[in-house]
Amino acid sequence: MTGLDALDWLVVGAYFALLAFVVWRSSRKQETSADYFLAGRNIGWFVIGASLFASNIGSEHLVGLAGSGAKSGVAMAHYELHAWCLLVLGWVLVPFYYRAGVYTMPEFLERRYNPTARWILSLVSLLAYVFTKVSVTVYAGGKVFEVLLPDLEIAGVNSFWIGAVTVVVLTGIYTCFGGLRAVVYTDALQTVVLILGSLCITAIGLYHLGGWAELREISGSERFNLWRPASDPEFPWPGMLFAAPIVGLWYWCTDQYIVQRTLAARNLKMARRGTLFGAYLKITPVFLFIVPGMIAYALVQKNMLVLGDPDQAFPAMVSQMLPVGVRGLVVGGLLAALMSSLSSLFNSCSSLFTVDIYKKIAPEASERQLVSVGRLATGVVIVLGLLWIPVMQRVSGQLYEYLQSVQAYLAPPMTAVFFLGVFWKRMNGRGAVATLVLGFFLGLAKLGCQIYAGSAPEGGLSAMQQVLVSYGSINFLLFCVYLFLFCCATLVAVSLFSAPPPAGQIENLTYATNTTAGRREVRESWNRWDIIHTVIVLLIILSVYVYFRG
């Protein structure tokens, strides 16, 4: 069974009509930049947690994680077990962000360090969104259409590009008009549909396969092992143990795309509990997306599923295995997830450009002008993301691995600057700027050399070409560890050899400079239930690590 039937299209249409209603209801009041970029700072814990999950579980998860599961097994689950990073966000960093009253992460860096650090992070973040998240999400949207509607063609344009452009245009429209409030409330709805739909795929896939025991037997112990040998070219255990947390802490604790939801919380308690709820949800992709990919691999081995390439695992199972009607609901959730991820990106890009760049250039701009500029910035990001899609296919054979490799080159300097800045009051602006500049330069150089190595001939290279190829061929996880250590050393050395930051500048921005009132506010924002749920999340993560040992 392939394609969609009339009932499927009816379900998809009804689902998007409901989404449109949610967007309309949530976007009627957009009077100020705080309303547009931070939803009026009045969001509760459930919506925050659901939005954290839906924004993270975009196309790169629906398509990329299932693809990795189909090709390599459970190894990519390391990234999905980063639910503990959300606990770090809620307990460690959110109190500083919330008390600072900032709109963006670069704005926090300016408060902690200096304006130069803010400029650097703003520009690099915008570029990173285009070259990783936006392009990957758009690419995955095209892959979904390619599988579900393989024969669709308009004026010589195939279904891949029709799908990619359609997802971008529709998402751009509702993001521009709805702002963050529309984004987070549609995220909450999409979270429910995503979980239910993905559970259907997992359950039906296991039913056709013959159960969990059959999956284990066909997959073998290696595919059920989170810990690969140190010599593994894709997932060496030292890299997964030490590098993956570096990327996870950057993404979940310092990335505007994620943290913006907590900045919109009604109060500090709602922000932290939103991260706790998000941590529970974050564990589910191991079973909702990676395991279906492994099921797809097993079904292919039994000649029960037709699969062109690993990245088609999830949409192929939707198209070929789900019954009519249910298939339409899951497809609606699948496409909505693509749009949810993109809408979050567009809103974050708007916030970064408007608050950190345009507002610095035009400080007298009115609230209406700020919202208009943010909407215009969305259009530019859309075009750049579409242009980058052909390039990214040369970097890595798998969608999700591409995203992780690029993030591994950009995360180390940001992780070092944020965490050392909060834990050590001696870190200063000069150290932060030096770390960001050198770290980003080395990371982008690695990306460039990796692209070059992918197209370089096998023989006849000069000495310089061989150096570039060797640098580009370093495993991205191991490179992430080396770069992080270099960035930490740079930040510490430059800071210690220059003047410390003024005491007034870092008040309530580091643990050592917290005021009595600040400590009291944090203590009053949690109780024993927050502790209990934190422990439960950690125990679940530990249990998954113990089970998936081959």
For each feature predicted by the language model, list its residue ranges.
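Membrane-embedded helix-loop-helix hairpins and adjacent transmembrane boundary segments
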Residues: M1-G550
